[in-house]
């Protein structure tokens, strides 16, 4: 099995040496035996014995080697964000584009379970092959992120809100990576709560350092803080999952009963919330925006 480890988790040219039932038999560059389920082969593909084709090689749960032409988002040499399918006591199960899911072991996740990723979050990972030829997800280290992020060496992003994901959590602060490749650090004094590992967040940029890394904040600007009426509406929106059946044409009596304010005060308050992009006003309802949710203190 020692030779097999050289090709597991990577893209290789394999020779087609036979067909056994519905399974193609392939041979690796070092003579490794690899199987390919016929269900993994596109209808237009017609493999010829003795010819070599490009495949991704992965182990099944028993350690036997299988191949696929559906190239995954990550390999043992490539990092990318992978979607979390579920979490359990073993860790986080992720989808990397293979016929089987891949586990990020619990030992690699935060010590506080409330900071573990949830289904739908994305983890920055690569593939790791252990001594028993099993395949796991490995979280990106700080060294890896430093080698791949896009530096920003000016103030062009100042006070801009950027979508990013948490890839590393420490007591001193949260480390984020955006879709554009920006690396962002949020000091613990600039957050009300800590995001989950892999959670998508909106972060306001407040500066940068000499390495081109951005500094961010989860706290609103002073002029974005809400007045009393706005805070009442915001708190109720959070309590009712981000949606309330009220708008500027709702009856004064209904507004008074629910919000304990006049219709004029209500209209002014939702107008301010809308201008700050904290809510959307739709026919018959108001809803929290992504920016609005980013203000929530869990």
Curated annotation (Swiss-Prot):
Gene: cvfB
Coiled-coil ranges from the UniProt annotation: none
UniProt name for this protein: Conserved virulence factor B
The family this protein is said to belong to: Belongs to the CvfB family.
Source organism: Staphylococcus epidermidis (strain ATCC 12228 / FDA PCI 1200)
């Amino acid at each position: 099995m020692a030779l097999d480890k050289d090709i597991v988790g990577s893209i290789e040219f394999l020779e087609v040496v036979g067909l056994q039932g519905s399974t193609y038999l392939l041979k690796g560059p070092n003579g490794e035996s690899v199987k390919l389920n016929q269900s993994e082969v596109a209808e237009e593909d017609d493999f010829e014995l003795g010819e070599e084709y490009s495949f991704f090689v992965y182990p099944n749960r028993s350690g036997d080697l299988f191949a696929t032409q559906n190239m995954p988002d990550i390999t043992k040499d490539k990092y990318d964000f992978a979607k979390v399918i579920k979490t359990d006591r073993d860790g986080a199960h992720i989808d990397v584009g293979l016929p089987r899911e891949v586990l990020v072991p619990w030992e690699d996740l935060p010590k506080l379970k409330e900071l573990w990723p949830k289904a739908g979050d994305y983890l920055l990972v690569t593939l790791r092959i252990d001594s028993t030829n099993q395949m796991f997800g490995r979280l990106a280290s700080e060294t890896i992120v430093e080698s791949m992020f896009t530096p920003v060496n000016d103030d062009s992003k100042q006070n801009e809100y950027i979508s990013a994901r948490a890839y590393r959590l420490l007591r001193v602060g949260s480390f984020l990576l955006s879709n554009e490749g920006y690396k962002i650090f949020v000091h613990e004094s600039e957050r009300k709560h800590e995001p989950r590992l892999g959670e998508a967040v909106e972060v306001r940029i407040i500066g940068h350092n000499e390495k081109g890394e951005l500094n961010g904040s989860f706290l609103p600007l002073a002029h974005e803080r809400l007045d009393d009426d706005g805070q009442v509406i915001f708190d109720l929106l959070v309590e009712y999952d981000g949606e309330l059946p009220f708008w500027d044409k709702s009856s004064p009596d209904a507004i008074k009963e629910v919000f304990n304010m006049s219709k004029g005060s209500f209209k002014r308050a939702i107008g301010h919330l809308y201008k700050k992009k904290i809510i959307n006003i739709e026919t018959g309802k108001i809803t929290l925006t992504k920016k609005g949710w980013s203000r929530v203190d869990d």
